[in-house]
């Protein structure tokens, strides 16, 4: 498979296994959910009725009218415990390496089919200027949420995009499924394409 490099008549040969794979929504969904869950702190904690501070003495007489109640730490009372109290836990899910890479390939392939994958020779800016990056992106028609992927991290590019909340800059090693799925357009350099193929092939 050959893909056109934007802004020139040149083409780059890419692997069908990486950029021409059939899209599996179930696979991508499972990997994206697992990736996001791995980032959860899992520190939420509530108290059960046995952990709440307070006496367990019976609050009122058994007889004499009114409802029958025991301790005021029961969940039905204000200040009482929580019935099914949340406890700190890990939300991590196991995702096999083969499965993770297959999902990344499926995402790249779908981006290519939808015309949301833009390959460029290079993506350099002369100085660390946010204004310069904005002007460059405006001329490329990349939508509101572009993801710029380079072979190696560029300090100029990273610092220029830091003040732009919807613009992400990653090198190939920093790619993840959530960033790829959430981007309107993925702008990737030709060198980065080769590195992606080495990683996923």
UniProtKB/Swiss-Prot annotation:
Keyword hit for RNA-binding: yes
Top-level taxon of the source organism: Bacteria
GO terms for MF: rRNA binding; structural constituent of ribosome
Keywords: Ribonucleoprotein, Ribosomal protein, RNA-binding, rRNA-binding
InterPro entries in alphabetical order: Ribosomal_uL4, Ribosomal_uL4-like, Ribosomal_uL4_dom_sf
Presence of keyword Transferase: no
Region (Disordered): 44-68
GO biological process, one term: translation
Gene3D superfamilies: 3.40.1370.10
GO cellular component: ribonucleoprotein complex; ribosome
Family per record: Belongs to the universal ribosomal protein uL4 family.
NCBIfam families: rplD_bact
Function: One of the primary rRNA binding proteins, this protein initially binds near the 5'-end of the 23S rRNA. It is important during the early stages of 50S assembly. It makes multiple contacts with different domains of the 23S rRNA in the assembled 50S subunit and ribosome.
Subunit details: Part of the 50S ribosomal subunit.
Name listed for the protein in its UniProt record: Large ribosomal subunit protein uL4
Lineage: Bacteria, Pseudomonadati, Pseudomonadota, Gammaproteobacteria, Lysobacterales
């Amino acid at each position: 498979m050959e893909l056109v490099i934007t802004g020139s008549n040149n083409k780059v040969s890419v692997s069908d296994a990486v950029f021409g794979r059939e899209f599996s929504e179930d696979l991508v969904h499972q990997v994206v959910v697992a990736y996001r869950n791995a980032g959860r702190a899992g520190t939420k904690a509530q108290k059960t009725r046995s952990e709440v501070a307070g006496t367990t003495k019976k609050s009122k007489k058994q007889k004499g009218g009114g409802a029958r109640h025991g301790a005021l730490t029961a969940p039905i009372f204000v200040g009482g415990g929580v019935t099914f109290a949340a406890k700190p836990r890990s939300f991590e899910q196991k995702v096999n390496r083969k499965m993770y890479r297959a999902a990344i390939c499926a995402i790249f392939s779908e981006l290519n089919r939808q015309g949301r994958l833009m390959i460029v020779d290079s993506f350099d800016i002369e100085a660390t200027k946010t204004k310069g990056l904005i002007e460059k992106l405006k001329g490329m028609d990349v939508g509101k949420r572009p993801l710029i992927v380079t072979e190696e991290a560029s300090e100029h590019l990273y610092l220029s995009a830091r003040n732009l909340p919807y613009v992400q800059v990653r090198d190939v090693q920093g790619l993840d499924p959530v960033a790829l799925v959430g981007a309107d357009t993925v702008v990737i350099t030709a060198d980065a394409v080769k590195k992606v193929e080495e990683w996923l092939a």
